[in-house]
Amino acid sequence: MNRKVLDELRWDDGYAIPVANAENKTLEEEMQKKEKEKIQLSNQVKGFEERIQAMADHLRNVRQELTYTQSLVRARENETESEEHFKTLSEREIGRLKQEIQRLENELVSLREKKNSHENNIFKTTQKLENLKRQLNWDQQTLEAWLEESARKDEDSMAIQKYSQKDDGKIKELSLLIEKLTLEAGQKRKLMDNELTETITAQIELDKTAEDFRKAHTERQQLISQWESTIGQMQKRDRDIDHCAMLLAQVKQELREKESIIKEKIQFLQSEIDNNKEYEKKISAAERQAAKLRLELQEQEIIRGRLQDELDSLKGVVDRTASDLETMRTEVTSLKKDIRNRQNRLQMAQEYNDGLSDKLNFVTESALSLEERALRMEEMFKEQEKTVKDLEVQLKQIREILFKKSQELHECKAKEKDVIAEINGGQVTLKNLNSQLQKLDSHALKQQGIMYNQDFQIQQLERRLSRLKGEVNTDEKQALEMRVSQLTKVFEERRAALKLLNTQHKKLQGDVRYIKRELEKTGQEKGDLISKKEEFNLFNMMSEKTLKKIKASKQDLMVEDNILKLEIKRLRDMLYSKADDVFSLEKRKLQLQTAMKERTEEISVHKEMLKSHIRYVDQERQNISSQLHERLAKVEKMRKRFEILTIAMMPPEGEEEKSQAYYVVKAAQEKEELQRVGDDLDGKIRKAEKEIRALENTLRVINGCNTSFKKSFSKITETSEEYDEKVQLEEEKKAAEEKHRYKQRQIRELQEDTQVMKNTFDSMINEELSYQEKAKELLPAITQLNKETEDQKQKLERVLKQYSKLSKHVRNAKKSKEETQEEKDINVRDLRDFNQSLNKMLAQAMEKNPDLATALQLYFHQFGLEIPTIGSTPGSYSSRSSSSRSSTISVRSGTSRISVNSGQSPRIKVVDLGLPPACPSSNVSSARSSRTSSRSGSSKSQKQE
């Protein structure tokens, strides 16, 4: 390899081959140490960044957990405040009820006292009546005596009648007072009954409100417990995530350490391989000097036969790999079919989501009540749960299939690795054997040449001797001819064997080329399979992420749905209670209206009856009074007639007079008869008056009921309790309407949010499909670019090798160890071209993506640079004089073209433009580091070759 490079450079054999001196070796060792330190530091930086990321995630989770706990604490505080509020309300209600009970007890005591006083008054009046009756119930003798005295003194009798009439009036007044007191007692009893019914209804309402409060309290506690359980689950998940993040960081750290160890081992292996190559060269040089070439030729022929057998076996292995490749292709086709099926399922799921969105739009457009919307939401939620379950089942099936396929792919990879290892081993052995064969052939040819030369020299010397002696021996001549013929036969046989070996060698080379082509094909197919596997992994990751998002949104929707259900249940209970109250009030109103109508009809009928009865009673009273007057007139007439008769019936003088007692008795009998008739009439009059009073009382009661009923329909004053109750009910109604409107607004907002989420999900799916199509379209371009990059890398390696050799040559010529002025000029021009190409790329990116302009302006202004534009970036590909400069510029332009083309692709564009703009010094250092890395890579490739 070194000889080829020196031949390309036209190196003179008179000069020694340049070797790195001690300083360069120390510099290379220091560079290797620095690279190791750099790798270790980069691994540490990555580990610290991952730890910082894990700590940030942990801090975010802790903050979220803190917010959840604070919301729980607030909920608990609100619950305690509401419980204290209800406790104070219940205490106030208990105090009010105690006061009401005390007031009712006081009223009962006062009513009992009044009742006792009224009973005492009634008892006293009854005693007075009995006394009067006793006074009136005189015996017959006192009556006769009184009649005698009354006959004597009519004035006294008239006075007694007056007093008796007064007593009768007092008795009537007392009886009326008793009736009035009894009526008042009945009214008080009615009021007491009304108060009792009101207190019972209030107690029932209080019990009902207490039950509602208990239900709400239990529901609230259940909701808080559910919330706590969900928060506990979320905390557990956060802890698991933190643990997994820590494990991931540890695994990454171990992986980086292992990678560094592997790199060191690879470097050590490379150095050992180089040493082995040197030793092999020495061994081959020693083997060239070995004797017994014929035995070695025979051994090589045996080895060649064995190699032929191995080649046949390798051909069989290649056939097996081809069959395995065919099976893998069939598996790839089956995987493509699975992808199509999954796409069809995804399309079906999208159609199902569209159907669900149509249902949601239909639900939102239709003017449904809260209950119907809640039922629709529940149905939709159940359907969505079914779809999610079906998707989960499908995902499980797909995962199982993917796991099986990945296992099969892993097995195929293992088989492929084994086959590649066998092929590589066979190629290595084949190369070694070919090299040994070539060496032996060359050595044998050299030995044959030496032998032929020696034989020829011997023959010439013998001829000379024979000529000098003058002897010509025919036997010797024949022997020589025989030997010449034998040697020619041997030469022909050797030539035929050489031809056969050359043909077999050509066949082996053809077979090796065929195996290499097959290996390249299998490598390409392996790369395709790996890319497809990565695509499947990405698809699975995206599907898992979408599934996680759907699960999270589903959990959020479940929580919101449960909250809405609870709120709807509470509103429904309130609505039912209010509806029951309204229904009971309406029912009571209807009952009152019907009762009022019936009562008005009864009152009107009763009024008519009372009026007719009053008219009848007035007529009877008038008749009785007229009869009384007539009777009094008759009595007066009879008295006058009696006087006239007494005067007329006075016996004449001489006849004995009838005794006075006779007339007194007769008058008393008539008076008694008249008294009895008068008593009967007085009894009838009293009875009629009592009936009239009773009717008046009933009329008064009816009028009172009518006035109270009219008052109930009259406007309520602001100072009354009913007005306060009305205001409170109106406020509750307004609050309920506000809550209803707020819940409707929340439902509309939730529906809008769900619609927005569906739209974003559809847009994300469309974007994903577009990105997949773009990726598929860009795959051939990427492969082409990769090929171009490989070609450019090879060119770059060659140019860098030439550049390093020329720079060493120039430095040796100038006898300087530092960079020359020409090298600095070349580096400056390279950096300028690189900067111009980078500015051009940034300007093109800003033209394609105007959103990046603001971020780039910020970065450029921070470092005091101007924003690049396409007009301001001159052409970076000017002509150069020297061939080395043109080659470096072509490499740079190739790399810039690669970067620009990669900037056109979405992925590499984001990676390139996501970096902050670097200052010139950083660009210089990056260019130098890339140059040094390329130099080291080229040196390694030289060693390997």
Curated annotation (Swiss-Prot):
Gene Ontology CC annotations of this record: axoneme; extracellular region
Classification of source organism: Eukaryota, Metazoa, Chordata, Craniata, Vertebrata
Keyword Magnesium: no
Subcellular location: Cytoplasm, Cytoskeleton, Cilium axoneme
InterPro entries for the chain: CCDC39
Region (Disordered), start-end ranges: 871-945
Name of the protein in its database record: Coiled-coil domain-containing protein 39
Keyword Cytoplasm attributed: yes
One matching Pfam family: CCDC39
Keywords for this protein: Cell projection, Cilium, Coiled coil, Cytoplasm, Cytoskeleton
UniProt source species: Xenopus tropicalis (Western clawed frog)
Superkingdom field: Eukaryota
Compositional bias annotation for Low complexity: 871-899, 921-945
Biological process, per Gene Ontology: axonemal dynein complex assembly; cilium-dependent cell motility; epithelial cilium movement involved in determination of left/right asymmetry; inner dynein arm assembly
Function: Required for assembly of dynein regulatory complex (DRC) and inner dynein arm (IDA) complexes, which are responsible for ciliary beat regulation, thereby playing a central role in motility in cilia and flagella. Probably acts together with ccdc40 to form a molecular ruler that determines the 96 nanometer (nm) repeat length and arrangements of components in cilia and flagella. Not required for outer dynein arm complexes assembly.
Protein family (similarity comment): Belongs to the CCDC39 family.
Coiled coil: 16-535, 584-604, 666-826
